[in-house]
C-alpha cells in the first residue's frame, strides 16, 4: 500500500484575520480598488505579500463591486510640467451635480499641481466671479498665494472682475485652449475621482449633506489615499517627504 508521506502531515491554514481586519478598515470608508487599498496598507507599515492580500481581498468579495454609473471612456491626458514646490501653480475647475429634488449645485475644486493637495473646495448653488474671488482670498490668507492659476474659459474665469483681481494680486492666469481639457489634466483627474467617490456614490437631499461627505472625503484624499503619480503616497505624505 503506497501512501504519500504528506498524508500524515497537517497543513495549518494561515491566520488571515489581521489582514481581513486591515482590509475592511480601508475598504469601508472609500470606493478604492485593490491596489489603492494595498498601498494604503503598505503606507501603514504592513509588509504582507500582495498575492496574499489579494487572495483575502477576493475572499471578502470586494472585487465584485458593481459600478454605480456607466463611466465615460478614459481621456488621453497630455503630461504637464510639475512645479518644483507648492504654491507655484494651482489648477481649478467646476463640477456640477443635482440634489434629490433636482436642484443644481456646483463644486469649485482647487488643486496644487506640485503634490495634488486639494487646497480648497467650495460647494454652492452658484459660483459667480465675486464668490470665486472671495473664496480664493480665504484660501490665500491661510495657505499663501500661488504664482499662477490654471483654469478653463468659463464665464467666471474670463470675467473682468476675476482678471483684474488676479492682476492686482500678481497672479498669472494660465487659460487652457477651448475644448482641450487635457491641458488641465491634474484637476480633471481629481474631478473624476471625486465624482466616482462622492457625487455618484450618494443621493444628497441638501447642500449641507454634500459639504459633510465632501469634507470627510477630502481629508481622506489629502492624507491617506495613495496617488499613482506620487509614488503611491497620499498628497500630504508626499509634501512632507519632499519638504520635510
Each language-model region and where it sits:
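Acidic/histidine-rich, metal-coordinating catalytic segments
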Residues: 143-159, 231-234
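Short hydrophobic alpha-helix segments
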Residues: 121-122
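C-terminal domain-tail junction helix/linker
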Residues: 167-171, 193-244
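Mobile-element integrase/transposase regions
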Residues: 47-111, 117, 130-138, 142, ...
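RNase H-like polynucleotidyl transferase catalytic core
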Residues: 66-69, 150-153, 168-186, 203-207
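Basic, flexible linker segments flanking DNA-binding modules
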Residues: 2-89, 180, 234-242
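Mobile genetic element proteins and their domesticated derivatives, centered on retroelements
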Residues: 1, 8, 23, 37, ...
Amino acid at each position: 500500500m503506497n501512501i504519500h508521506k504528506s498524508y500524515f502531515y497537517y497543513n495549518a491554514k494561515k491566520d488571515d484575520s489581521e489582514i481581513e481586519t486591515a482590509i475592511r478598515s480601508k475598504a469601508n470608508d472609500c470606493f478604492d480598488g485593490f491596489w489603492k487599498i494595498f498601498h494604503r496598507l503598505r503606507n501603514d507599515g504592513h509588509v504582507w505579500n500582495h498575492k496574499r492580500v489579494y487572495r483575502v481581498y477576493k475572499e471578502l468579495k470586494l472585487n465584485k463591486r458593481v459600478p454605480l454609473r456607466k463611466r465615460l471612456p478614459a481621456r488621453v491626458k497630455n503630461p504637464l510640467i510639475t512645479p518644483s514646490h507648492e504654491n507655484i501653480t494651482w489648477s481649478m475647475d467646476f463640477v456640477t451635480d443635482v440634489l434629490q429634488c433636482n436642484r443644481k449645485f456646483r463644486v469649485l475644486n482647487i488643486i496644487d499641481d506640485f503634490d495634488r493637495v486639494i487646497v480648497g473646495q467650495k460647494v454652492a448653488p452658484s459660483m459667480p466671479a465675486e464668490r470665486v474671488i472671495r473664496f480664493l482670498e480665504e484660501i490665500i490668507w491661510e495657505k499663501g498665494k500661488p504664482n499662477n492659476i490654471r483654469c478653463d474659459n468659463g464665464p467666471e474665469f474670463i470675467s473682468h472682475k476675476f482678471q483684474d483681481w488676479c492682476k492686482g494680486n500678481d497672479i498669472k492666469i494660465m487659460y487652457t485652449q477651448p475644448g482641450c481639457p487635457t491641458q488641465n489634466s491634474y484637476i480633471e483627474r481629481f474631478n473624476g475621482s471625486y465624482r466616482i467617490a462622492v457625487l455618484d456614490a450618494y443621493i444628497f437631499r441638501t447642500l449641507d449633506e454634500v459639504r459633510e461627505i465632501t469634507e470627510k472625503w477630502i481629508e481622506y484624499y489629502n492624507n491617506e489615499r495613495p496617488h499613482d503619480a506620487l509614488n503611491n503616497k497620499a498628497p500630504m505624505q508626499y509634501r512632507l517627504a519632499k519638504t520635510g
